[in-house]
């Protein structure tokens, strides 16, 4: 499926602020949430609608409302930072959780937690994580949501690189990928360059 880089001056400006080493955890979190919110317009453009009869102050007419449940699936812990921005525009979205960690030596992905929600098989499922680096965590998370029965899945991140994009497309060709930026490369430690650093540490102030 397609890879979409969502380019917009507001997103580019906020992402630049996040990249700076001197940016505080507070500002990092706020900009992350705001970028996630700005990306919602593009990510949800194919959300299903149903017609409804309504009455305005001047006449009766037909309107349209969302007719598809939405489930957000943050990859813990950094994915949590993207929830607030998305939920501001999709307040009825339910939240499932997947906890993964990456072995710093082997770069292999390991699961430590997973909690689904009802009717995920009928829902529009968005897996979120700020970084798409090697693709290990994204692929593992999507493996899990497919085991839960999810069929309509998108992966949303802030920053992605070609190795992660390619791996996700190869393992899950039915999943659309959205990013605010396609960065240059991975370094020898598997970190995105220029990237954001460790997003989880910067969100929670644990660096």
Curated annotation (Swiss-Prot):
SUPFAM superfamilies: PRTase-like. It holds the Pfam family UPRTase. Transmembrane segments: none annotated. Uracil binds at residues 192, 197-199. Allosterically activated by GTP. Its cofactor is Mg(2+). InterPro entries: PRibTrfase_dom, PRTase-like, Upp_B, UPRTase/APRTase, Ura_phspho_trans. It is an enzyme of class 2 (transferase). 5-phospho-alpha-D-ribose 1-diphosphate binds at residues 77, 102, 129-137, 198. GO terms for biological process: UMP salvage; uracil salvage. Keywords: Allosteric enzyme, Glycosyltransferase, GTP-binding, Magnesium, Nucleotide-binding, Transferase. Pathway: Pyrimidine metabolism; UMP biosynthesis via salvage pathway; UMP from uracil: step 1/1. It catalyses: UMP + diphosphate = 5-phospho-alpha-D-ribose 1-diphosphate + uracil. Belongs to the UPRTase family. Catalyzes the conversion of uracil and 5-phospho-alpha-D-ribose 1-diphosphate (PRPP) to UMP and diphosphate. HAMAP family: Upp_B (MF_01218_B). This is Uracil phosphoribosyltransferase. The gene is upp.
């Amino acid at each position: 499926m397609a890879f979409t880089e969502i380019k917009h001056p507001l997103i580019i400006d906020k992402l630049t602020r996040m990249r700076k080493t001197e940016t505080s955890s507070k500002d990092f979190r706020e900009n992350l949430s705001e970028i996630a919110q700005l990306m919602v317009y593009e990510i949800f453009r194919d959300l299903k609608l149903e017609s409804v009869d309504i009455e305005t102050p001047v006449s009766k007419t037909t309107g349209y409302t969302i007719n598809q449940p939405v489930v957000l699936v943050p990859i813990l812990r950094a994915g949590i930072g993207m929830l607030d921005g998305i939920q501001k525009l999709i307040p009825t979205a339910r939240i499932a959780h997947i906890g993964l960690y990456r072995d710093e030596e082997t770069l292999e992905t390991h699961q430590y937690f997973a909690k689904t929600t009802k009717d995920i098989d009928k829902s529009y499922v968005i897996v979120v994580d700020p970084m798409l680096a090697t693709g290990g965590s994204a692929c593992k998370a999507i493996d899990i949501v497919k085991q839960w029965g999810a069929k309509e899945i998108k992966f949303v991140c802030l920053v992605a690189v070609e190795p992660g994009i390619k791996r996700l497309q190869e393992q899950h060709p039915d999943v659309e990928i959205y990013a605010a930026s396609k960065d240059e490369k991975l370094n020898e430690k598997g970190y995105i360059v220029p990237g954001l650093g460790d997003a989880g540490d910067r969100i929670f102030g644990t660096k």
